[in-house]
A protein has these predicted regions:
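Terminal amphipathic alpha-helical/low-complexity segments used for targeting or macromolecular assembly
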Residues: 1-58
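A detector of tandem-repeat and repeat-rich interaction/domain scaffolds
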Residues: 56-93
Length: 93
């Protein structure tokens, strides 16, 4: 069964406002999956984003581990950011 998210009227993750780090004065929030998709299970913790504009709710895009996406960067479609990677400065994955 294909576990790619196809319905876009709901969110696949939430920002954990009480679980954050700061980089150069910018808060990055840990993400938590709200649904199962691809190899991500509901309640799995992901990496860090500055806001929802950094990670699409569509497709299988995900940020794993302690990876960070911020500063106008975006992960979309089936893009993955792993381990301790940092994506920023309007990069598109």
């Amino acid at each position: 069964m294909d576990k790619t998210l196809q319905t876009y009227d709901w969110k696949k993750y939430e920002l954990l406002k009480d679980d954050y780090i700061e980089i150069s004065g910018v808060k990055l929030y840990r993400i938590r999956a709200l649904v199962d998709f691809n190899d991500v299970k509901k309640s799995d913790l992901g990496g860090y984003v500055q806001g929802e504009e950094n990670l699409s709710h569509e497709g299988n895009a995900w940020i794993y581990g302690n990876a960070k996406v911020y500063g106008g960067a975006k992960v979309q479609d089936n893009g993955l950011v792993l381990d301790n990677a940092e994506v920023y400065n309007n990069a598109l994955i």
